Amino acid sequence: MVFFPEAMPLVTLSERMVPQVNTSPFAPAQSSSPLPSNSCREYSLPSHPSTHNSSVAYVDSQDNKPPLVSTLHFSLAPSLSPSSAQSHNTALITEPLTSFIGGTSQYPSASFSTSQHPSQVYNDGSTLNSNNTTQQLNNNNGFQPPPQNPGISKSRIAQYHQPSQTYDDTVDSSFYDWYKAGAQHNLAPPQSSHTEASQGYMYSTNTAHDATDIPSSFNFYNTQASTAPNPQEINYQWSHEYRPHTQYQNNLLRAQPNVNCENFPTTVPNYPFQQPSYNPNALVPSYTTLVSQLPPSPCLTVSSGPLSTASSIPSNCSCPSVKSSGPSYHAEQEVNVNSYNGGIPSTSYNDTPQQSVTGSYNSGETMSTYLNQTNTSGRSPNSMEATEQIGTIGTDGSMKRRKRRQPSNRKTSVPRSPGGKSFVCPECSKKFKRSEHLRRHIRSLHTSEKPFVCICGKRFSRRDNLRQHERLHVNASPRLACFFQPSGYYSSGAPGAPVQPQKPIEDLNKIPINQGMDSSQIENTNLMLSSQRPLSQQIVPEIAAYPNSIRPELLSKLPVQTPNQKMPLMNPMHQYQPYPSS
């Protein structure tokens, strides 16, 4: 590209300015015309060069004028909008007049053409009859006004020499600075980093040192015209074919060396595998030999023969007794089985005391037959009926569990009627609807059994009679309420819940007083206790006033009361609640 001095006139035309290629007889018909670079702030087009086919139109060959080029109807989009101060029929020239220089003639020239409607009327009343206006650059005289055209008035031609600030801004660009420096120092034209080496840029050689800034000759290093698309299909909304930066990046990617990964073996090496040899005639140790190596056992015998087999287990084979214990609140139970002919039963144990079951059973039977006969010693009269899991051995040898309700420990059996709806007395054949009524009838009339005893020594066959008797002692002396509280039968929190009875103290005079006390406090307490009578001696006179006095051997089982401890009163809940029936 070549820019000219600042004295270069400004052409202000209406509508749009279309740059063209000068096709003189001394220049090739096609040439490469680079567009301005993006480094100039006046342009918004990319810096990719484009070549356009031009059609020659000879207008005036007598004056040796350069042929005119037909107008290509495309616009250059300026990055700066026109100033509002300019006339409505004046358009800014945002493209330098010398941006498109074609050919390598001895006399370089710059031409431009405009597309103007013939009926356009200017402010001075003149009209533009010709569609093209040409301006020629002479050899040494620089720019001169174009020859007068009949269609353009003198005042209109004078506008070409009027300077404009917009044009000065355009000339003061980096390309103008490059031209001045290139003419003096023979510098190459600046190229964008995205341009290709095959683009037809020119460079100047300063061969004549004259006073002008215009180089005397132009040398092209590539005069071959590049292929350009059809001008009718040019769209300056650039497509991907006209984006040099993407092409440049693609070239860089293609220039990258190929990375070859190391080939790893994809096949698994074959390791030798030896098939195990099988000999059907090989000697296999017989079952007799294997059994003979076992330790001697009375339940196992070996008989010799062609097919040696072990004899079946005898039906009568003594096994050691198994002793198992449950949790802390369960009692131990020992089961001795003399003989078995099936699997080993599975049992669970409840709060019953130690029981001893002896007998034998066959497969298909249960342990309930041998657990019915138990020792009833040590059970409280009002204990709830316990539940026991019994292991049942089926005919197929599998273990089956079922729950059965263990009968309460009663000394008197309660027979049922044949229908099972009533209870019949075995002595008088009297029927009762409830078992406790029948049991009470037998104890009071037939056996005269009195299992309920008071601390005073009196016995009762019914528990409710005992409670009525105890209330007499409590009403006479409230201090005796703690002795008749049924702590062995009920807990203090939930009535009806059985608790374990506490171990009685053997001697009331043995009072522990040395726990958590100093030596001085222990001496004072001993002196105070020595001056007082034992608690058992204080209780006896009060009870002796009643006909049924407490026997001396029962006093040793009374709880202990310290001198500073108050006597607890009977809980009203315990005093008036009904007790469980016998």
Curated annotation (Swiss-Prot):
<dbReference type="Pfam" id="PF00096">
    <property type="entry name" value="zf-C2H2"/>
</dbReference>
<feature type="compositionally biased region" description="Polar residues">
    <location>
        <begin position="375"/>
        <end position="392"/>
    </location>
</feature>
<keyword id="KW-0479">Metal-binding</keyword>
<keyword id="KW-0539">Nucleus</keyword>
<dbReference type="GO" id="GO:0005634">
    <property type="term" value="C:nucleus"/>
</dbReference>
<feature type="region of interest" description="Disordered">
    <location>
        <begin position="24"/>
        <end position="55"/>
    </location>
</feature>
<dbReference type="GO" id="GO:0008270">
    <property type="term" value="F:zinc ion binding"/>
</dbReference>
<feature type="compositionally biased region" description="Polar residues">
    <location>
        <begin position="107"/>
        <end position="125"/>
    </location>
</feature>
<dbReference type="GO" id="GO:0006357">
    <property type="term" value="P:regulation of transcription by RNA polymerase II"/>
</dbReference>
<feature type="region of interest" description="Disordered">
    <location>
        <begin position="375"/>
        <end position="422"/>
    </location>
</feature>
<feature type="zinc finger region" description="C2H2-type 1">
    <location>
        <begin position="423"/>
        <end position="446"/>
    </location>
</feature>
<keyword id="KW-0238">DNA-binding</keyword>
<dbReference type="GO" id="GO:0000785">
    <property type="term" value="C:chromatin"/>
</dbReference>
<keyword id="KW-0677">Repeat</keyword>
<keyword id="KW-0804">Transcription</keyword>
<feature type="region of interest" description="Disordered">
    <location>
        <begin position="347"/>
        <end position="366"/>
    </location>
</feature>
<dbReference type="InterPro" id="IPR013087">
    <property type="entry name" value="Znf_C2H2_type"/>
</dbReference>
<feature type="zinc finger region" description="C2H2-type 2; atypical">
    <location>
        <begin position="452"/>
        <end position="473"/>
    </location>
</feature>
<dbReference type="GO" id="GO:0042594">
    <property type="term" value="P:response to starvation"/>
</dbReference>
<dbReference type="GO" id="GO:0000978">
    <property type="term" value="F:RNA polymerase II cis-regulatory region sequence-specific DNA binding"/>
</dbReference>
<dbReference type="InterPro" id="IPR051059">
    <property type="entry name" value="VerF-like"/>
</dbReference>
<dbReference type="GO" id="GO:0000987">
    <property type="term" value="F:cis-regulatory region sequence-specific DNA binding"/>
</dbReference>
<keyword id="KW-0805">Transcription regulation</keyword>
<comment type="function">
    <text>Transcription factor that globally supports gene expression in response to hydrogen peroxide.</text>
</comment>
<dbReference type="GO" id="GO:0000981">
    <property type="term" value="F:DNA-binding transcription factor activity, RNA polymerase II-specific"/>
</dbReference>
<dbReference type="InterPro" id="IPR036236">
    <property type="entry name" value="Znf_C2H2_sf"/>
</dbReference>
<keyword id="KW-0862">Zinc</keyword>
<keyword id="KW-0863">Zinc-finger</keyword>
<feature type="compositionally biased region" description="Low complexity">
    <location>
        <begin position="126"/>
        <end position="143"/>
    </location>
</feature>
<feature type="region of interest" description="Disordered">
    <location>
        <begin position="107"/>
        <end position="154"/>
    </location>
</feature>
<protein>
    <recommendedName>
        <fullName>Hydrogen peroxide stress regulator 1</fullName>
    </recommendedName>
</protein>
